[in-house]
Amino acid sequence: NSARADLCVALAKHTGMSPERMMVADVFSHRFYKIYQLEESLSSILDRDDIFIYEVSGRSAIGENSREDVVLPIYLRERTPARDYNNSYYGLMLFGHPLLVSVPRDRLSWDALYHILLYRLSRYVTRPSSDDEDDGDEKDIEDKDNIPKPGHVAGASSQDSGAGSGGAQLWSRRRKPAPVDNSPGPSHWPQRARRKHLFTLQTVNSNGTSDRSTFNEDTHAQPYIAIDWEPEMKKRYYDEVEAEGYVKHDCVGYVLKKAPVRLQECIELFTTVETLEKENPWFCPTCKQHQLATKKLDLWMLPETLIIHLKRFSYTKFSREKLDTLVEFPIRDLDFSEFVIKPQNESAPELYKYDLIAVSNHYGGLRDGHYTTFACNKDSGQSDYFDDNSVSPVTENQIESKAAYVLFYQRQDVARRLQPQPSSSDPPASPACGSPPNSEFMDVN
């Protein structure tokens, strides 16, 4: 259960960077999904997550900016044709990797920020030549709106414009407002400010859009800045190959096979104390305020028939996906005795043990799919595979698969009570597992 600080200290040994200048962020779909604070736990990071480490000047925390520096999250966007809204918002589509840029507090003007970002992007952005500058001067003299005014994006709709309070001030804090750029307007700026600008700047929310409905009601919230490129300018000056390139470390070549998860581990996690994150606080009925808290679920009594629903779908702010992790579950003797906080009868262990009687499988994705079932005949003990109108016998080692979605267990004392008593004339019962099914009717891969 390491914190961000532990990760930064470990990385400092390999990189020589100061851990105080590191910031850790979870990046998904060209956005910051989460920016980790100094003592925040990293336990929520999954194997499939893309974790970025940034080096910034000053103190390395979004919410703990020094008096001299402000750390700004920066997104890259490209204007798309108005008819293409499949992956864009108001004709602006995110691309590339987001940035965290430390900006001196006394340089919080749009013109200064433009040149700071141009410098930060210098590894993969070509500066205009003198001829380009001359061409840009002629065009900008005719159309001064091309200069990156505070919060303005040329050609954007009124909904996507930064006009108003969202674009007039780059940074404000509840305790002490930062200086606001009160420099003269574009018509009074020196001639160099009317040179050809490669991109424009826009205040956005954490999703990378300017939709006011998704802004936090707190006007002092952390600002995000978008660098908006016109397609022709991006193609001409932005080296996308260089920007997406990276040095592959030797350890990256070893792809670990996704380890299966035991059902017992899932139950342990289900009953473990959970610390609620800041984004999911608990509402206290006494003080009527949201508070940081812990949560724990316990088992008080056990039912005769236990239904376990495996979490097969993952939902985040930006995506939904199907989880295909193999969960290993026992066919018999699933023991819950250690998870019950009020034992009913310690001398009767069958009150806490379960045997599997059925499994519901799901194939497909979130929007559509196909369901099949494994079920055990209570009289014969034979397990069968049900797929629409076909039924096939299966062996126990065929029941466990990545498609398992809902597990049905029966308590052992109930199973014994319901089991028919064979007479002396009855033939012996069939074994618990039959012969393998015909492959023509069954597919459990």
Swiss-Prot record:
Composition-biased stretches (Low complexity): 420-439
EC number: 3.4.19.12
A biological process term (GO) from this entry: proteolysis
Residues of the active site: 362, 370
Name this protein carries in UniProt: Ubiquitin carboxyl-terminal hydrolase 11
Family designation: Belongs to the peptidase C19 family.
Gene Ontology molecular function, alphabetical: cysteine-type deubiquitinase activity; cysteine-type endopeptidase activity
Known catalytic reactions: Thiol-dependent hydrolysis of ester, thioester, amide, peptide and isopeptide bonds formed by the C-terminal Gly of ubiquitin (a 76-residue protein attached to proteins as an intracellular targeting signal)
